[in-house]
Amino acid sequence: MKLSISCICKISLSIVATLLLLSQVFNTRFLQDDYIVLGFLSESTWIGWLNAVWLGQGGNLWPYGFHALLLTSSVHTVNTSLVAIWTLFVVAVVTLCNLTIFKWVLGEDIKMLGKLKIMTIFSISYLGFEGLFTPGLISAYSYHLASFSHLWPITLLIFALYQMSIGSRNIFLAFVLGIFIGNSNIAESTTAIICFAIMFILRKKDFFFTKEFYEKSKNFYYAVFSGTIIGFTIIIISPGFWNRAENSVGLPSSASEFVRRFFRSFSSFFADLITHPMFWLSFLIGVLISKPIKSFNDRANLINKIKLLLSLGLILFCSLTIGSTFAYVSWHQSTGLYQIFIPFSFLLGFYSESLFNLKSSKSMKKIILFMVITSLLLLSLRATLAFEKRKTDWDNAFKTNVCLVKNDPKSKLLGAEMLYPGFNLGIEDVSSWEWMRDGYAKWISNPEFISEFKC
């Protein structure tokens, strides 16, 4: 039986994504913020950790709290099982989020994804984060504190909007979603508040479905909006938020410094987005599985839905840019953007014939298929080798570091970094940052820590 180009594309995506995910899960090792949490928990309690975060870091307690819970089973031994399993759970949540987006935008056309619908969405959801210059799969699925702070709030916001669109009346769910969205990170919380505020201001106008969202589920809307504001307020009233704002990087001291930092933030996020390979590959994947629109009304409805996604992405982009202007820019802060722009790009490709009059011949689709598969194989091969190398480096460094700390607690430790070429962005380790080293040393030097290695 001869397979169609669309079917070959879906099968290839599924195989590459599954193998790469297994590699990431089986090569899971602790990284960056994990060390300071493990070090703290080896000497104190989970409640003590939340108190320390409140006083010194900020009021976004649920990301730090959940992250610490993931590590509680690893305080006295090297046990990455729960962290690895959580990676699978996050992949499932992101896949469900994208299924929600596609179900809302595509409607009946979601059947066009065929029998491999779930696997196709899973593949796009998982592979969508891997960058050209940054290990995006790590930031989304293994760097759990970053994921809780930047990816989860946008995922939950999309889920909340979908619940409103179908007229959900579950007030408790709405309020809890709002708390989690608002108490995540300033930029993402601000994005949600702006979206809900626009919805209220335009509640009587059908501007990007504001009237539809509001009228179908008013009580849900008020509950999720209230929860978001409460969660956001908890962040900014904490002593740690202002302590970090003043002492970490510091607020801009002049107009010229503000402008310089603003353009640095803008250029960083913009460059990250346009050089992100899956932003373009998702469009091409959509072209390979494309479907024309039959009626003018369907086209107008589709355009409004895609504009809504774009508007959400632009609001988040602006929030991230302004937020990092007052703080700092880091490579792992873009995960929320990918959660919006990767499905957005796929949808543009899926309806490219109707939206842009882009008609691809069979021979052209074969070329596109070759480009997509080749690009994904190269990206996946690099990521797999990077996962394997970091695991090996981490294990070897751990054996050495246990003995180094026993002999001299202040000795220089070996690290296991995962930096992508170009700008040397990625996972740094105990050999580069003193705060990571201190947490790591406290963790492995704890008298109750169990190590199989003899020095």
Language-model-detected regions and their locations in the chain:
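Membrane-interface micro-motifs in multi-pass membrane enzymes
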Residues: 114-165, 316-351
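Transmembrane alpha-helical segments
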Residues: 90-105, 153-165, 193-201, 285-289, ...
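Transmembrane catalytic cores of multi-pass membrane glycosyltransferases
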Residues: 20-85, 89, 144, 186-318, ...
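Signature aromatic-anchored transmembrane alpha helix within multi-pass, membrane-resident enzymes
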Residues: 170-174, 225, 299-310, 353-382
